[in-house]
Amino acid sequence: MFLTRSEYDRGVNTFSPEGRLFQVEYAIEAIKLGSTAIGIQTSEGVCLAVEKRITSPLMEPSSIEKIVEIDAHIGCAMSGLIADAKTLIDKARVETQNHWFTYNETMTVESVTQAVSNLALQFGEEDADPGAMSRPFGVALLFGGVDEKGPQLFHMDPSGTFVQCDARAIGSASEGAQSSLQEVYHKSMTLKEAIKSSLIILKQVMEEKLNATNIELATVQPGQNFHMFTKEELEEVIKDI
């Protein structure tokens, strides 16, 4: 006798007869409630752009972080439950520092994503990593950086699946943004074009009017460290779109 759907819903480690893990599927749905984030990989570097939802005029916009630095050569954009993202971000930062201390070299973007996805998969285990949770993480991440292979962009979802992308959108308006990215992206795209395209797409999908306080923008270029755009720099870029 099969259990009812609601009983499969409650078990994070139980497959349904159709071979589905409902809790993981629900975690992926949680991403669709998050703010929109876009990552674009070019030969000149990677750009990450994220919408910041300012729900009250009394909120301090600078306190909302949607793009963070993992290491000098890697940045990460997030969408979904930000509290869940903090645990994964901490894991990524510890891994990059341990790698540096152990091997005296910077960690590749793929290796960082792999380390974080391993933690994302450990939900519900009794002897899991101390950072693991009793449920799947309700957050999707875009890791953008530069390593010996050049500029790299990786997308990771709550199932622990990660994949390299040329351009990727996550969050509430990801479907519309992804189809727009497919139209504008080309292999010879410059970083400047990528920045402009990502902001134009954000402008199209955001409910609020795009300005320097309700978006975040960061780039990572070969030979240069992770750079988060200041409010003044954002205003300059927004003028052009």
Curated annotation (Swiss-Prot):
GO cellular component, one term: nucleus
PTM annotation (Phosphothreonine): residues: T55
UniProt keyword Methyltransferase, yes or no: no
Phosphoserine: modified positions: S16, S56, S63
UniProt keyword annotations, A-Z: Acetylation, Cytoplasm, Glycoprotein, Nucleus, Phosphoprotein, Proteasome
BP GO annotations: proteasome-mediated ubiquitin-dependent protein catabolic process
Subcellular locations according to the entry: Cytoplasm; Nucleus
Domain of life: Eukaryota
Tissue-wise expression: Expressed in fetal brain (at protein level).
SMART domains, per the entry: Proteasome_A_N (SM00948)
Modified residues (N-acetylmethionine): M1
Residues glycosylated per entry: S198
Pfam family, one: Proteasome_A_N
InterPro entries for this protein: Ntn_hydrolases_N, Proteasome_alpha, Proteasome_alpha-type, Proteasome_alpha_type_5, Proteasome_asu_N, Proteasome_sua/b
Binding partners and assembly: The 26S proteasome consists of a 20S proteasome core and two 19S regulatory subunits. The 20S proteasome core is a barrel-shaped complex made of 28 subunits that are arranged in four stacked rings. The two outer rings are each formed by seven alpha subunits, and the two inner rings are formed by seven beta subunits. The proteolytic activity is exerted by three beta-subunits PSMB5, PSMB6 and PSMB7. PSMA5 interacts directly with the PSMG1-PSMG2 heterodimer which promotes 20S proteasome assembly.
Protein purpose: Component of the 20S core proteasome complex involved in the proteolytic degradation of most intracellular proteins. This complex plays numerous essential roles within the cell by associating with different regulatory particles. Associated with two 19S regulatory particles, forms the 26S proteasome and thus participates in the ATP-dependent degradation of ubiquitinated proteins.
PANTHER family the UniProt entry points to: PROTEASOME SUBUNIT ALPHA/BETA
NCBIfam families membership: PRK03996.1
Protein name, per record: Proteasome subunit alpha type-5
Upper lineage: Eukaryota, Metazoa, Chordata, Craniata, Vertebrata
